Each structure stands twice: as C-alpha cells, then as structure tokens.
C-alpha cells in the first residue's frame, strides 16, 4: 500500500513538474510574440500615399476602391496596434475583422471606428471599397479638441465600434 501511494505521489509530482515546464515554455513563447504597433506615419511609409489622398500634419483622408489591390492587408493579418484614430466607411463588399476580442463584419454602408492603441486584426476582405479618415492623437490635440470631453463617446465606440448606416 505504501508503494502504491508512493507511486501515485511520484507520478503526480512528475506530472506537476511537466506541467510547470510546459507552462514556462508557453509563457516564454507568448512573451516573445509581441503585438506589432505602429503610427499613422509608419503606416504611410510602408503603404505609401496615392496622389488623390489628402494628408496634412498627421491626418489622412483616403479612398480605396479595391482594398485587396490597393492596400497591403498583410500588415493587419495578425493582431496589430495602430496608434491613430480611424473612421472607416465601407461602401461596397465586406471586411471581417477583430477589434480587441470582438469579431466584426464591416459590410456595405457600415461605419467602423478604431481608437488609438486598440488591437486590430483583419481576417478577410471580400471585394471591399472603403473611405477612411485616419488621425494621429497629436493632430486631434493640435486642433484643440479636448479629448476628456469625448470620454463618454469613446466608451460607447469602444463597446460598439461598428455601426451599420
């Protein structure tokens, strides 16, 4: 009987040790995989601007008639943190994305709002055309909009970033 208890204790300690090793390995991998983060300026450096895009001092207004052909969606294939406000209107097709931990389908005539620092991932794009306004936080501050006054609005947008029109 003592040997049975000893065997159970030995295997339980061994399993516990194996579990601790497994958890350390997983946590180590999670720590190594950091979420990519970039600003509007970096996004423009990577993707470039088209002649018809309007850009002024940290604010971009742009349209992409065929998102797949005109924009590098691979940047958002994995969770990414974009440090800019973005208001995106989908006029055609659809985009399936995840904002934070919530999955959204941004369909035709849908407005999507991204807050700075939120995590965004694009899963698929189906024949989408979009119109977008992207602004760095500093741009909003320079034009004297008091972000504290918009706290309630930001809380609602954070809960419901996608709005069918």
Where are these regions (language model features)?
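N-terminal regulatory/effector-sensing and dimerization cores
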Residues: 61-162
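Generic protein-terminus/edge-of-domain signal
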Residues: 2-95, 104
């Amino acid at each position: 009987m003592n040997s049975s208890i000893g065997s159970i204790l030995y295997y339980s300690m061994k399993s516990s040790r194996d579990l601790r090793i497994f958890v350390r390995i997983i946590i180590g991998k999670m720590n190594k995989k950091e979420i990519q983060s970039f600003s509007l300026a970096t996004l423009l450096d990577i993707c470039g601007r088209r002649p018809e895009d309007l850009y002024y001092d940290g604010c971009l207004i742009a349209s992409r008639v065929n998102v797949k052909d005109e924009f590098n969606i691979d940047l958002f294939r994995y969770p990414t943190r974009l440090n800019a406000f973005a208001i995106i209107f989908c006029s055609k097709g659809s985009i399936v994305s995840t904002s934070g931990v919530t999955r959204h389908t941004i369909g035709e005539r849908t407005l999507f709002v991204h807050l700075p620092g939120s995590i965004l991932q694009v899963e698929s794009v189906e024949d989408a055309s979009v119109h977008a306004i992207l602004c760095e936080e500093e741009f909003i501050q320079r034009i004297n909009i008091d972000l504290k006054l918009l706290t309630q609005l930001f809380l609602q947008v954070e809960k419901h970033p996608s709005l069918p029109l």
